[in-house]
């Protein structure tokens, strides 16, 4: 019976880590879904890359990866998000 709280805690930690939007390498589609968006505009100098969430996710999102490796979910319709995506695409082409 004492192992149940530990197992529950491990499951909760796993679910929360999925929430952060961990992505797969070499793909433009994130491995997991976002459940909430960041409410702050990230400084451009922090941004390294981006990915889109899967179409099967309940909320469409863009997951930005910072230069420190943090994953941040953002609303795709936001103007700053669209601008950052365009800038990152330009960098990839040059």
Swiss-Prot record:
Superkingdom of origin organism: Eukaryota
PROSITE patterns: SMALL_CYTOKINES_CC
Record-linked Pfam families: IL8
CDD domains assigned to the protein according to its UniProt record, in alphabetical order: Chemokine_CC
Major subcellular location class: secreted
Signal peptide: 1-23
Subunit structure comment from the entry: Monomer.
Functional description taken from the UniProt entry: Chemoattractant for eosinophils and basophils. Acts as a ligand for C-C chemokine receptor CCR3 which triggers Ca(2+) mobilization in eosinophils. Also acts as a ligand for CX3C chemokine receptor CX3CR1, inducing cell chemotaxis.
Keywords: Chemotaxis, Cytokine, Disulfide bond, Inflammatory response, Secreted, Signal
GO molecular function: CCR chemokine receptor binding; CCR3 chemokine receptor binding; chemokine activity; CX3C chemokine receptor binding
SUPFAM superfamilies: Interleukin 8-like chemokines
Record protein name field: C-C motif chemokine 26
Family, similarity comment: Belongs to the intercrine beta (chemokine CC) family.
One Gene Ontology cellular component annotation held by this UniProt entry: extracellular space
A single BP term in Gene Ontology: positive regulation of chemotaxis
Subcellular location: Secreted
